Amino acid sequence: MTNPAETARPERQRKPDWIRVKAPTSKGYGETRALMRELGLNTVCEEAACPNIGECWTKKHATVMILGDVCTRACAFCNVKTGMPRAVDPMEPINVATAAAKMGLEHIVITSVDRDDLPDGGAGHFVKVIKALRELTPNTTIEILTPDFRNKMEAAVESIVEAGPDVYNHNLETVPRLYPTIRPGARYYASLRLLEQVKRHDPRIFTKSGVMLGLGEERLEVHQVMDDMRSAQIDFLTMGQYLQPTPKHAKVIEFVTPKAFDAYGSIARAKGFLQVAASPLTRSSYHAGEDFRQMRQAREAQLAKAAQKA
């Protein structure tokens, strides 16, 4: 007879107090949710079960997820549905721009699912969204968070860079050693090359990348990722705690303390990043508008200092 203790599903680690957030209830949260529903837009805030959704939506900040809500990849950390996606919505670019205008956004973050089924990986749709935003709400700064455009990267990145986003984000997610289990459909060095290519095409565009901690990475491996990012001229590093969305996803190996995040942040700044966000609740688009303004100021100060020395 089987022992029930042997077949019971292992318990997930209990979240420490520093990772807990209040359930969203504010008026602003409700208004943001209603507008997304009205325009038929998906958000990564909901699809990825982001812990900051209450705070961000209360402030009417949202990260719009284009190209549908079904991904062609199955990463071990991600809560977005996997399968065969539906056809691309031709009205999505104008709907995204309409949402940005109605919310009065100074800064918008656009991300997407992976669309390996599309000939260009969805790059053309990113371009249409950027153009619609520039036309309808020209004062809104635009940050994009793209997939890796596997086997289509060069043409995809070139077309998006030509559309002129203000920030190009692509997350490395974790250290190279963990890619086979955590991000099996991607390649670490291909993601680095993507970000290098953005800078080659247009050095004025800010580049950004992020990693999750708590998946079993070693401290020196994280330092090496920072060095790799700086070699690729990445301007902005985000670091946050990985949280297991469901029991089917990769387990949390460690809850990294706020003090440890502070230490990583200090090291990253010493390595030369223009901007660093490192805390348990940091996510790619968390406080993105405020961080963008600080990063732009840091670059201006850097250029002014260089001009004085010349």
Curated annotation (Swiss-Prot):
GO CC terms in record: cytoplasm
Name its pathway: Protein modification; protein lipoylation via endogenous pathway; protein N(6)-(lipoyl)lysine from octanoyl-[acyl-carrier-protein]: step 2/2
**Xref: InterPro entries:** Aldolase_TIM, Elp3/MiaA/NifB-like_rSAM, LIAS_N, Lipoyl_synth, rSAM
> Where does it primarily localize?
cytoplasm
Superkingdom assignment:
Bacteria
Q: Name one GO molecular function term.
A: 4 iron, 4 sulfur cluster binding
Kindly list the positions annotated as binding [4Fe-4S] cluster 2: C71, C75, C78
| Record: residues binding [4Fe-4S] cluster 1 | C45, C50, C56, S285
Query: Which EC numbers does the record give?
Result: 2.8.1.8
Family classification: Belongs to the radical SAM superfamily. Lipoyl synthase family.
Protein name per Swiss-Prot or TrEMBL: Lipoyl synthase
Identify the species of origin.
Novosphingobium aromaticivorans (strain ATCC 700278 / DSM 12444 / CCUG 56034 / CIP 105152 / NBRC 16084 / F199)
What gene name is given for the protein in this entry? lipA
